[in-house]
């Protein structure tokens, strides 16, 4: 099962890459819908509910990781913490650390250098627009490719391998797409990310989830 989903994710990633090669201006067009040209700013702000969501997406992984680590340590020494689903909880945490943590925020965001929409010339910035998968030196760290906030929504993919029926897996998939897409739209409205940043974020988190599952649960497939 894991191998199928990993291959599926890689195939989707390839065709998404081809799609954005064929339509290189799509990112600019999508971002333009969130840009107020008369005010020279993006319509989404960092106050109120949007500000809370942005804060939550940034700091929830820290809070969650601390709780999980304390719980797992406690389960080693305290009987009442020794529950049936300890491995499942650890799996969900590892998916967070590997997908949104390592792959999204460290490998890509800190090393790809893609300038954010608010930084490019088309939206009153001074940087040159770069398509996805093109490494750039215009941004030093915490850059546009891919979307970190959206990865927290796509992290819900981690529940898919743990659910028994196809219907429940589908519900988890839809929930991840809705949550990740919603957080991605929020960041697009703030000028923080392009559409392709959100798309590839979802793909990367999906693939990393099933890789973690293959390593933790299905080693015999490899």
Curated annotation (Swiss-Prot):
Membrane topology: Multi-pass membrane protein
Family annotation (InterPro entries): LpxF, P_Acid_Pase_2/haloperoxi_sf, P_Acid_Pase_2/haloperoxidase
EC number(s) recorded for this UniProt protein: 3.1.-.-
Pathway of action: Bacterial outer membrane biogenesis; LPS lipid A biosynthesis
First-level EC class: hydrolase
UniProt GO cellular component terms: plasma membrane
Residue spans crossing the bilayer: 4-24, 59-79, 88-108, 145-165, 170-190, 194-214
CDD domains assigned to the protein according to its UniProt record, in alphabetical order: PAP2_like_6
Keyword Lipid metabolism part of the UniProt annotation: yes
Chain ranges on the Cytoplasmic side, renumbered to this chain: 1-3, 80-87, 166-169, 215-222
Any one Pfam family match given in the protein's UniProt record, by short name: PAP2
GO molecular-function terms, A-Z: hydrolase activity
Keywords: Antibiotic resistance, Cell inner membrane, Cell membrane, Hydrolase, Lipid A biosynthesis, Lipid biosynthesis, Lipid metabolism, Lipopolysaccharide biosynthesis, Membrane, Transmembrane, Transmembrane helix, Virulence
Subcellular location: Cell inner membrane
Periplasmic side: 25-58, 109-144, 191-193
Disruption phenotype: Lipid A retains the 4'-phosphate group (giving bi-phosphorylated lipid A) and a 3'-hydroxyacyl chain not usually seen in wild-type cells. Cells grow more slowly in liquid culture and are more sensitive to the CAMP polymyxin B. Bacteria are avirulent upon infection of C57BL/6 mice, the natural host of this bacterium; they do not colonize mouse spleen. Upon mouse intraperitoneal injection induces pro-inflammatory cytokine IL-6 and monocyte chemoattractant protein 1 and keratinocyte-derived chemokine, two potent chemoattractants; bacterial viability decreases about 100-fold.
One record GO biological process: lipopolysaccharide biosynthetic process
Domain of life: Bacteria
UniProt keyword Signal, yes or no: no
Family of the protein in this entry: Belongs to the lipid A LpxF 4'-phosphatase family.
Other facts noted in the record for this chain: In Francisella lipid A is mono-phosphorylated at position 1- and tetraacylated, it lacks the 4'-phosphate residue found in E.coli. More than 90% of lipid A is in a free form that lacks core oligosaccharide and O-antigen.
Role this protein plays: Removes the 4'-phosphate moiety from lipid IV(A) (a tetraacylated precursor of lipid A) and from pentaacylated lipid A, but not from hexaacylated lipid A (as is found in E.coli). Does not dephosphorylate phosphatidic acid, phosphatidylglycerophosphate, or the 1-phosphate group of lipid A and lipid A precursors. Its expression in E.coli confers resistance to the cationic antimicrobial peptide (CAMP) polymyxin B.
Protein name according to UniProt: Lipid A 4'-phosphatase
Top-level taxonomy: Bacteria, Pseudomonadati, Pseudomonadota, Gammaproteobacteria, Thiotrichales
């Amino acid at each position: 099962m894991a191998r199928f989903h990993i291959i599926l994710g890689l195939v989707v990633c390839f065709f998404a890459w081809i799609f954005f090669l064929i339509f290189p201006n799509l990112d600019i067009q999508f971002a333009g819908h969130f840009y107020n040209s008369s005010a020279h700013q993006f319509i989404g702000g960092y106050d109120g509910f949007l500000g809370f969501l942005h804060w939550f997406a940034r700091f929830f992984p820290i809070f969650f990781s601390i709780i999980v680590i304390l719980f797992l340590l406690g389960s080693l020494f305290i009987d009442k913490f020794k529950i049936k689903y300890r491995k499942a909880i650890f799996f969900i945490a590892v998916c967070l650390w590997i997908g949104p943590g390592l792959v999204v925020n460290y490998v890509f965001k800190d090393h790809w250098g893609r300038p954010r929409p608010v930084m490019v010339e088309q939206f009153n910035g001074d940087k040159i627009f770069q398509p996805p998968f093109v490494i750039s030196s215009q941004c030093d760290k915490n850059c546009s490719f891919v979307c970190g906030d959206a990865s927290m929504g796509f992290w819900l993919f981690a529940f898919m391998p743990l659910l028994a029926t196809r219907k429940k897996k589908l519900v988890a998939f839809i929930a991840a797409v809705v949550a990740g897409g919603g957080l991605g739209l929020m960041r697009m409205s703030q000028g923080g990310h392009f559409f392709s940043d959100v798309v590839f974020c979802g793909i990367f988190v999906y693939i990393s989830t099933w890789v973690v599952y293959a390593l933790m649960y299905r080693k015999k497939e490899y």
